[in-house]
Amino acid sequence: MKEKINVTIWNEYVHETTSERIGAVYPEGIHGAIKKMLSKYDNFNITVATFEMEEHGLTDEVLNNTDVLIWWGHCKHAAVSDEIALKVKERVLDGMGFIALHSAHASKPFKLLLGTTCRLKWRENDEKERVWVIEPSHPIAKNVPEYLEFAQEETYGERFDIPTPDELIFVSWFEGGEIFRSGCCYNRGLGKIFYFRPGHEEYPTFYREDVTQVIANAINWACPDGITKPILGHVEPLEKVRDKFEGMDESLKKHEYIK
């Protein structure tokens, strides 16, 4: 594991500045709460970025120096720059970890990476949620209790239009009867992706120790470490082999294709 993991927390930071009620829950923004809670872990270097920053705070320099990107978004999904979303996708394919929280299921980077609508059932009704750990030996479940109970949360329900997860770590039950795949792992290219469901902006979810533990575990799991990047495109043989073009004109050796 890397001695220090560079973590960037991206948050729209809109609800907290436009709603007094939500601003009272997260006076320093959702990103500020997550940063504060993660600061107890001494192996994280934490940076924050928000929608209103230039390039949404995700410049090439920031992205290239980010090991794991955490994303929380809701009301500005469509307004996020297509160019920035594509850059995030490419960085994940190149090895950067990506953690999508709650309504980030509908974010541009997440949908680009998963290739589906990522739509779901939902209801805002202050209902109880119980998040069950179904893979207790997985690194993301390390030091996490058998279940996490939230007295009030936004309800999500199946069907969740996502590809079948490579690994499913958590499943949620809601007071109104819905169930939901609430902790999903994916591999895309050289990068790892984790989706975690809890975290509606009206509730102090991100101040909880157990939620912070899940996020910290996901950072450690998703962090690229010791990746030997494969050589792609045309390569010379490792062993001595016959040259099928020997004696032919050099122009015959050239092929037009996407490298």
Regions found by a protein language model. Name each.
Residues 2-4, 124, 188-194, 198-259:
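Extracellular ligand-binding/catalytic regions of CAZymes and related secreted enzymes
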Residues 44-45, 64, 120-197, 232, ...:
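Catalytic beta-strand/loop cores that center a nucleophilic Ser/Cys/Thr
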Residues 48, 100-101, 195:
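Hydrophobic residues in well-ordered beta-strands that form the structural core
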Residues 68-72, 195:
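Structural motif
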Residues 76-143:
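A glycine-rich, often tryptophan-bearing local segment used as a flexible ligand/cofactor-contacting loop or short
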